[in-house]
């Protein structure tokens, strides 16, 4: 099975949520209580080695958690992520307050609470924060 197919399948929840959101408007954490908490057993905060990928047509996607490392990374890269048109997944988040903290770190970016386990398996990924583009992984 191709890497693209392995990544595309777990993004179904994310795509449904994204399609129902207003453009450029982050989801209100209280409307997402039904999916919280989010846990990603295959992922943890840590260093990600850059790697080349071939996922033509994929919209840039980043994975973050509620940890300090993720929040600092998100704050540092928010402008670049916005320029890329990247969407975010909060792959480790306890509650609406933690989700709101993540979203407020990068106003203007859509960040959804979705487990990253299937993406981690498909891309052989162990850590976040990470940016996934059509051409590679980077931190």
Predicted features along the sequence, with ranges:
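Helix-rich interaction surfaces within compact, conserved domain-sized segments
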Residues: 106-114, 119-124, 130
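Non-globular targeting/processing and membrane-anchoring segments
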Residues: 2-4, 14-61, 65-109, 117, ...
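Charge-patterned, long linear interaction tracts outside catalytic cores
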Residues: 8-11
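A short, hydrophobic beta-strand/beta-hairpin element that forms part of a small beta-sheet core
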Residues: 129-138
């Amino acid at each position: 099975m191709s890497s693209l197919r392995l990544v595309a399948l777990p993004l179904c929840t994310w795509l449904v949520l994204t399609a129902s959101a207003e453009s450029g408007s982050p989801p209100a954490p209280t409307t997402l209580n039904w999916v919280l908490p989010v846990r990603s057993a295959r992922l943890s905060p840590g260093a990600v080695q850059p790697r080349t990928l071939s996922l033509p047509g994929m919209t840039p996607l980043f994975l973050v958690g509620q940890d300090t490392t993720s929040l600092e990374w998100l704050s540092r890269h928010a402008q670049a992520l916005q320029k890329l048109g990247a969407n975010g997944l909060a792959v480790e988040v306890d509650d609406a307050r933690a989700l709101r903290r993540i979203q407020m770190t990068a106003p203007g970016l859509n960040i959804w609470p979705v487990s990253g386990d299937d993406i981690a398996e498909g891309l052989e990924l162990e850590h976040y924060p990470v940016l996934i583009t059509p051409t590679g992984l980077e931190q």
